């Protein structure tokens, strides 16, 4: 479910909400695995807005991981600061 319809005002509000959150998904030395994607999906289903911690010092690799993770989970990258990502995906209200 793409969330391209978020305005900059919405993104600012989500950033403010995310400020107090702790990372619930940790991506380690093995990078983006199917287990990490599944765990991210579970957390997005439960919380809508989550923080993800990405290990490693290579900035380009962290950006690539963020893009791949967003594509795999149909989430939107709200913020990327250092090794922290903030992802958002609206809850499915059809269920």
Segments from the language model and where they lie:
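Positively charged, polar, low-complexity stretches
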Residues: 2-95
